[in-house]
Every structure is written in structure tokens, then in C-alpha cells.
Regions:
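Cytosolic regulatory regions built on CNB/CRP/Popeye-like sensor folds
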Residues: 1-158
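Single conserved hydrophobic/aromatic residue that forms the stacking wall/gate
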Residues: 159-168
Length: 168
């Protein structure tokens, strides 16, 4: 399972821990343009992209879409601010192609944190890595349109070319 492999890059899980995590991952599929998260909604989940591509965005005062990030196959994703601060989301997260996801809800993660004390360290390290990637990406696209920012991203895709072919 790709999600377990990604976790094991930072936190080496034993067999019992692996089974615990697998038991709390919920399979979810999104069709192209489906929303994983809506603006002004409570975010109580963290996802992992087994297959597909997601985008987070919001609208400016003039109604223009502002892309904040792309989430690619093999990565965890969420609205970090909304999840960790228990605030309403300031972004939408939508599928750019059909996606296969695995999702943790907050209750499951609380159980995992209780059973695997090292999980808090994993979250900190992963959150720092994601935040740095997001900051670097945002620096590159701050003055770009949605189309230009997607072009920038598509030039450095690290996942299968099948997903890239599905994006129009």
C-alpha cells in the first residue's frame, strides 16, 4: 500500500502499527471536478492520493480563481491550516482527474496517535516538508494565472503520464 510506504519513509512501522493504520484508512474515489473540501467547511480529514491529481484554490475579490497548490499521486494532502487549527477552510480542494484516495478522519488519527506515540513526530516532519514545498510552489506562482500555474506544475510532474493525459 502506497500510503504505508510513504509513512515508512519517515516512521518505521512494525506489523501491528501497519495493521492499525490500514484499519483506519477509508477508501474514497473522486471523479474529475468533484470536491474533496469546500470553502468555509470544517475540515476533519487528511487524504492520501493513491492515484490522481488534486488542486486547492480559492477566489479573489474579483472572482478569479487563485491556485494555492497541486497534490499529486503518492502524497498526503489537506488544508493544513483548517485541519490543525480547527477553523473553516479557506480553500476548495478538487479532483483534476478521477482519483483513488485513502482518507483518515480526525477520530481515527486520534486513535493512531494514542496507539503509536511516534505518530506526532511523523506529523510534524511531514507537515514541515509539505509546508516547505507549498511555500516554494507559491513563491513561483504568486503572480501566475490558474492556467500558467498549472503549466508550471505540469512541467515537473512526478507521477504517471496517464494522469497528465487526463487533465484538460
Amino acid at each position: 500500500m502506497k500510503a504505508i510506504s510513504e509513512i515508512n519513509k519517515i516512521l518505521k512501522l512494525n506489523d501491528d502499527q501497519t495493521q492499525l493504520i490500514k484499519s483506519h484508512l477509508i477508501k474514497n474515489t473522486l471523479s474529475k471536478n468533484d470536491q474533496f473540501l469546500r470553502l468555509d467547511s470544517r475540515n476533519d480529514k487528511i487524504g492520501f492520493i493513491d492515484k490522481g491529481l488534486l488542486r486547492s484554490f480559492s477566489y479573489d475579490d474579483a472572482g478569479n480563481e487563485i491556485t494555492h497548490d497541486f497534490f499529486q499521486q503518492g502524497s498526503f494532502f489537506t488544508d493544513l491550516n483548517s485541519y490543525f487549527n480547527c477553523t473553516l477552510s479557506k480553500v476548495f480542494i478538487e479532483a483534476l482527474v478521477d482519483c483513488d484516495l485513502y482518507v483518515f478522519n480526525r477520530t481515527s488519527l486520534d486513535i493512531i496517535k494514542k496507539e503509536i506515540p511516534e505518530w506526532a513526530s511523523f506529523e510534524q516532519i511531514y507537515r514541515a516538508q509539505i509546508s516547505m514545498c507549498l511555500l516554494n510552489f507559491q513563491r513561483k506562482i504568486i503572480h501566475s494565472s490558474s492556467i500558467d500555474s498549472f503549466t508550471l506544475f505540469s512541467n515537473c510532474l512526478l507521477y504517471t503520464s496517464d494522469a497528465a493525459d487526463e487533465v484538460d
